[in-house]
Amino acid sequence: MTATDTFWELVERTAADHPDRLVLADDFGRTLTAAELRDAAESTAAALTADGIGPGTVVTWQLPTTLETMVVMVALARLGAVQNPVLPIWREAELGFVTRQLDTEVLIVPGTWRGYDHVALAKSLAAERDMRIVLIDHSVDPAGPALRLPAGETSVLPPPPTSGDAARWIYYSSGTTAAPKGVRHTDRSVMAGSAGGVRMIGASSDDVNPIPFPVSHIGGAAMLAAGLLTGMRLVLFDTFDPETTPFAIARHRPTLLGTATPFYVAYMAAQRRHGQRPLFPALRACVAGGAPITPELGRRVRETLGVPGIADAVRATSAPVVGVSPIIGGAVVRGMADHCLPAIGVETS
């Protein structure tokens, strides 16, 4: 696939070239093809225009890792809104801080999810300033293949964005003080690291990559872009229970696993409980992000899961992914080693 300037252009081109390719699945048995993702995003985008969302509207969204969330993310990219994905575990202090700092115009929430009333939180924040609330209801698990999303008439949609260089994504990291640190990204910066990263691990349409982490992390958009670029299928899990989720993931026969130390600890514990037979027999590589992977953990993953090691990419929020560690093999390496990704335009010294 040739390069695209905008996130929406990537979605459109994939849907045109590979309409029936499965790009997303979840643990409820639902799937979305490239064409279904495009169509659902356009319909949702049309519905969101009725809530006053359009080009340049600042939208903070706090949604779990579901098909609906991926569609909302793409719908906002279609509209050219400025989207600010935030972690579902954030509460009044963090969410209040970022919505005030960004002067958020629309806040999208999942309703009551995992026992917490996000609408009540949103209303308490909206009482302090002018901010509209949009509900994407996640209070009940899916009962069938239908998406829990609003739908609208696509004829009302504005033209899609044409520039991939406008800052339309704002991600927050914890930083080094108590206040979250916001980072502005463009479509091109979100997509750049994914394109290089998948070349590094050789992702293809034969790959199945489970996503048990919050897709409101920049890795969510980056992995979706990677899937659209390569045909790699993403399987979404809205929660991660270290006792049960590794076995649920195993049922999808993943070829890739990620993404951070707690997940790998859970995968290895599940493998030990499973016995000598590989729990993940199709697994060929592991990818990490969020925080550096220690050589010791890489060694344990090699020995327990039978893969060459872990390709580690960190600081994705602060800047596009520009380098990943080599997949560690052989003796434990002290310190860190990185390979700059091709076509990123970064020099090291």
Identify what each model region corresponds to.
Residues 191-208, 215-256, 270:
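Conserved AMP-binding/adenylation subdomain of ANL enzymes
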Residues 64-84, 88-92, 101-106, 207-208, ...:
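A short helix-loop-beta submotif of the ANL/AMP-binding
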Residues 229, 254-258, 268-336, 347:
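Gly/Ser/Thr-rich phosphate-binding loop
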Residues 2-23:
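A short N-terminal helical cap/helix-turn-helix that marks the beginning
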Residues 37-46, 164, 168, 183-204, ...:
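Conserved structural elements of the adenylate-forming
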